[in-house]
């Protein structure tokens, strides 16, 4: 049990050293198809601007090399580490300096510094054009003409836009993408069959990318202790019947898998993830009764299914926690003997009893418990000091409960679009220095929490909502870190992972902010507004709303609502006009003048 939070222990350490050639070992374990897919993802995540053909060429060279090593492990260079092999390969790209600038300096470094340097240059917001979906017939033709290239292009386009996408999971998405085309390109109505499937994959993919980004941020910014604590809480909720030792083993293995993927070690990560799935399926009886249906599936589907599996039923006769963690006279002795194990067990016991709490709340409770023990175990009468520790949890529990209740009520009342607008106003007032596109993206996603979580039963609302908000706010933190503009954002993002959401919730109107000068150009619109999709229209209107609040941070709800209603009416009027552009040219300045007057 002492191994729970010690990173030295890991089953991977033991099998690693027996292979003369790491690249041959991974090729044999993963098979050619997965090997090639993962190498393509790795290269696309590092060199996000390189053309597709360049990457395919690199992947083919690495694959041919791996095959020579499989044939003879002692062949030249086969004993080199994967980082050395891949890094050397990346550094052969001729246009490295002109395309990536200072990233080319990484090539002068030795491993492991070189790989760290490449990782630091991954761009979370790469300047790439949005993906445009071709006509269905065009896609089906491309799929039939060259299925392999079609699927590689999918891996490449997603990986370069999402440099931290969980690689083995991206292979699963690609398999579903392939299945959708194989089925729908045969269908009578291709579009009706295919488009909903592609929309679903796109939305799920974006969600998967964002969830993984939070895992990588936890590991990179807060260390593996933070990730392990998160994993103990989550797995204890999922597997309440499993023993603590079993949960600890899974946490250790899961931490290794994610550390590897977040570190760009995609072959090791995928191999270890497959081992973990195998282990879980061989030991279902001591983990969870819910794993059965996952374990019959093929590998990629199996791993995905295990990751998403629903919570097992709680054992019926769990005793009260107070006996061991409050009433016992040995609390301080047990804590002092092995602090992290004792806290890990506390977190496990609390989490398995509370599938209705968010993981972040459970971690806050464990943190509060730790702080109380640190204080009380040094006191004259420790037991007297910590006797009321569970009462101190109450406000911590009520805060997210009330937050979810209030925001779900607001969502029910307003609907998604107007709920997003309320959040846009709220967040622009808190952190007006943040760029408008980032505020729009983050607030739109925060607003999606309503449709995602508010219709769930009470017991599932908080874990759904708060853990989703943590994922969305991490996106704000990641974008803000690239171009920091607000000390408040930096403070909320870096001080504490588990308190990020309460930190943002607690921010008030930024009094120090100097309002942005009014710029008529920002509020000038043209006839192209009329041909936009509903979503694009919303983004345009929401962009204007953010700019209004930046110009008048103290505007009231009523004032802003008046201006937005006028805006909608003005756009609708001009889009119905015979000469649309003339209408925008004439009505636009009137709208701007009326808005300024309304906000004066």
UniProtKB/Swiss-Prot annotation:
Binding site for Cu cation: 19
Membrane-spanning residues: none
Binding site for Ca(2+) 1: 22, 260, 265, 268
Residue ranges occupied by any Albumin domain in the UniProt entry: 11-202, 203-395, 396-593
Sites of Phosphoserine modification: 21, 74, 81, 289, 435, 505
PTM per Swiss-Prot/TrEMBL: Phosphorylated by FAM20C in the extracellular medium.
Entry GO terms, CC: cytoplasm; extracellular space; protein-containing complex
Binding site for (4Z,15Z)-bilirubin IXalpha: 256
GO molecular function ontology, one term from the record: fatty acid binding
Protein localization: Secreted
Any one Pfam family match given in the protein's UniProt record, by short name: Serum_albumin
Keywords: Calcium, Cleavage on pair of basic residues, Copper, Disulfide bond, Lipid-binding, Metal-binding, Methylation, Phosphoprotein, Repeat, Secreted, Signal, Zinc
UniProt propeptide residues: 11-16
Entry binding sites for Zn(2+): 83, 263, 265
Subunit structure: Interacts with FCGRT; this interaction regulates ALB homeostasis. Interacts with TASOR. In plasma, occurs in a covalently-linked complex with chromophore-bound alpha-1-microglobulin; this interaction does not prevent fatty acid binding to ALB.
Function in brief: Binds water, Ca(2+), Na(+), K(+), fatty acids, hormones, bilirubin and drugs. Its main function is the regulation of the colloidal osmotic pressure of blood. Major zinc transporter in plasma, typically binds about 80% of all plasma zinc. Major calcium and magnesium transporter in plasma, binds approximately 45% of circulating calcium and magnesium in plasma. Potentially has more than two calcium-binding sites and might additionally bind calcium in a non-specific manner.
Protein name: Albumin
UniProt source species: Macaca mulatta (Rhesus macaque)
Name of the gene encoding the protein in the UniProt record: ALB
